[in-house]
Amino acid sequence: MDPSPLSISIAIFSLLISFLLYKKLTTKLPPGPKPWPVVGNLYDIKPVRFRCFAEWAQTYGPIMSVWFGTTLNIVVSSSELAKEVLKEKDQILADRPRNRAAARFSRDGKDLIWADYGPHYVKVRKVCNLELFSPKRLEGLRPIREDEVTAMVESIFRECTQQDKIGNSLVVRNHLSGVAFSNITRLAFGKRFVNSEGVMDEQGLEFKAIVANGLKLGASLSLGEYVTWLKWMFPFDEEAVAKHGARRDRLTRAIMEEHSLARKESGARQHFVDALLTLQEKYDLSEDTIIGLLWDMITAGMDTTVISVEWAMAELVKHPRVQEKVQEELDRVIGVDRIMTESDFPNLPYLHCVVKEALRLHPPTPLMLPHKASANTKIGGYDIPKGAVVHVNVWAIARDPNSWKNPLEFRPERFQEESIDIKGNDFRVLPFGAGRRVCPGAQLGINLVQSMLGHLLHHFKWELPEGMKPEEIDMTENPGMVTFMHTPLQAVAIPRLPSHLYKRMAVDM
């Protein structure tokens, strides 16, 4: 007698259940909070995720399982486990998880940030390391950075010396944002969209609108991104994303065309768009990859610079002893008859320690961009299945009392007492990541943060608004992938150099 369809179905179902039970019993996942059906731990996670995960690590340990819907996420919160993820198991854990928005924006990983590890990633990484962020190119673009930093100084001086504003506090972030915006658009596109009066041109307004719209679309994630079989209930707004992509590409192509014509007339310049167009044939770079790389640099470099400097300034206003010590070093090395340049950096070790300490306590990306397991592996003795998403809690690691003495104290001297690298070689402090995914623009970021901070402290003394106490500064973070201060820092800027040293050192390049 032939088996009936019902008996075949029952047999298949029984085998499936047996397999799933066997897999569950033999797979040793890291501990973690108990997930709810369908949604996992999504509704247990507090808005500031890295703080929430640090709290959970106190209960479940330095490696834990957190379920985003039906997707397993592994969160590590110790330097030892970070080393295992980013060095010892680096190749297996070097892929990127892409939600639907990231997949569309990156053309399914044709850029650098969202590319899986493979031949394409290796190629574009080589372009970044050898060409875009080479010491020679960074030095060639230095005049742009120094131009924009001195423009910031000029704008602060103009505001704080107005007759009706002397002694008033200013919103520090407003002045930092202008530097970051113009610096990154000039480095990437060779475009300063803002004139000397602060008026933005039409192309600049379009650029800002594209950036804002991209952030809005990227943040609008639905439950369907975390529960694969619910995607049909949460349709992706393909039309809105397609319009955004077309708008972004239209602006970028127009700028690329301008540079292509200029190259024919006067040769290539140092900007990233010129470099990529020049290298397009040598490295077989598609137009999608060139556009993707340009926007990777913009999204990675704009907010993170502002965040890093604002947090550093908050700590320096809160700790006047440290501020005075930096200013003593600046006065000793530079004096009061000229302004600082990047060539002064080797003679300003304490300033560099302040930058390191600020990045330790306030990494701009506190949860490293997620990695994905390309095969089954183990971390800390636990099973990590293929497809699991792995997060490194950089913020928690940098505040771990097992790695740092008095970890919550802002004390730059700790970097004088011990030589500690912050570009991926010391797993206790990882503001730029490490391993195959380490940020290729780390040195550029450090240079700009150090330059901005040095000029702010050399040109001005910074104080709290009248009547405000240091402990009243809001040192909490906004939710999000990057850590803006929840309340923008306000401080009083008091000029400390001769007035002729507050002029912008403009360059045309």
From Swiss-Prot:
Residues annotated to bind heme: C439
Metabolic or biological pathway: Alkaloid biosynthesis
Keywords per UniProt: Alkaloid metabolism, Heme, Iron, Membrane, Metal-binding, Monooxygenase, Oxidoreductase, Transmembrane, Transmembrane helix
Membrane topology designation: Single-pass membrane protein
EC number(s) on file: 1.14.13.-
Cofactor(s) needed: heme
Xref: SUPFAM superfamilies: Cytochrome P450
Tissue specificity note: Mostly expressed in stems, and, to a lower extent, in bulbs, roots, leaves and flowers.
Residue spans crossing the bilayer: 1-21
GO MF annotation, one: heme binding
Keyword Cell inner membrane applies: no
Name of one Pfam family that matches: p450
Family per record: Belongs to the cytochrome P450 family.
Name of the protein this chain belongs to: p-coumarate 3-hydroxylase
UniProt source species: Narcissus pseudonarcissus
